[in-house]
Amino acid sequence: RLRQMIATVPVSDAIAIHLSDSGITVEGDTKGVTAVSGKTVTISASGNYTVDGTITDGQILVNVVDPTADSDAVSLYLQGVTMTSSTGAPCILGQSAGKLKLTCSGINTLTDTAAAVNADTSGVIYGDCDITVTKNSTGTLNITSSMNTAIRSKDDIKLNGGDISINTDVDATSDADAIRANNTLEIDGASVTVTSSADGLKSAKEDVSILSGKVSIKAGNDAVQAATALNISGGTVTASGDRGFTLDENGVLAITGGDVLATATDYAFGMDSAGTAVTVNTSGCTQGVVQLDYAAEWKKSNAVTLKKGSSTVFEMTPNKKYTYVLASSGSLSGSDSYTLYTDGTQMTHDGSDNGTFAMTGTLTKFTGVQELAGGSVTPTDDTVATALVYSGSSVTATNASGSVVSNPSNLTIS
């Protein structure tokens, strides 16, 4: 019954493709499916196709005969699909099509464990056309790759729905990007979680745009790399990497909405992926952006908090250790002053002796960020004593977990 529910055809004219190691079967008007050969099913015309089942070293090959004349989308409705490639060939290969659209329901898992057979078409999902994960996606798309990009397009990529989880950091001997578009890469409504051994989100020639959704990135190289522009107008973005946001010379950063935290260990914002200083146009930012260059490295669990008076206006936690931070929120103003806390400890910077972070414009950079001597500490669960234990001549303070609180001078007894 569960399989029948997952495989329910969403549109009346859909062709149903059932994947299996014992053989791929096709139901419906198969005029758009030219062939089933072994473990490969070839789609040669635009239209709607439902896909379910489990297969090892199988492939969905989209090869529209004349994509100029037949420019409508090939729409794949992934409904509980599990595909594994041990040969390096893409699980879904958009070799020739006007557009490739994926709508996910249930849990869909795509995995590869070997280097690409053909570098030109490397990727667990690859297309020479636009690739879209549609807003009608209600399920999950999990992609794990040891050596190849998870989603790659020679044109645009749009992630408009669903829960997309990508891990390309499973093989310490190789680097693989998570999501790479030659042209525009856009996220508008999807929840995207990335763990990448190389770059997280990448546009090789154009822009990366995040309009809405939730984006969380942990990258070995650039968390987000854009050639021409990085536009963020909504959503929640946590982007951590050896490098955070990188742009080419004369690139544009435009943050007009959303809550944003980008962190890095190698280079501050304003450097390209090679560590060369570049000119970035930030005039398109309409909400406060704070750039923090710390004097020392901090752990990934150390939250970055900005307060105005006693009110917290920004607080986010990185996905990776960091030295450089770019933070933005609609609650931040380019003309206000704030106090900064890192892991609950008040900070100061080169231009202040009292811990005041005074904004002097929409984007303000602070260098030499370090702990403020004698500054306040925000109590946390670990530093708040909930019990005092008397033993002989000594008193020990413990927290809610029963652990001894090691900093009694900053205890809050409750």
What are these regions (language model features)?
Residues R1-S414:
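A composition-driven surface/loop motif
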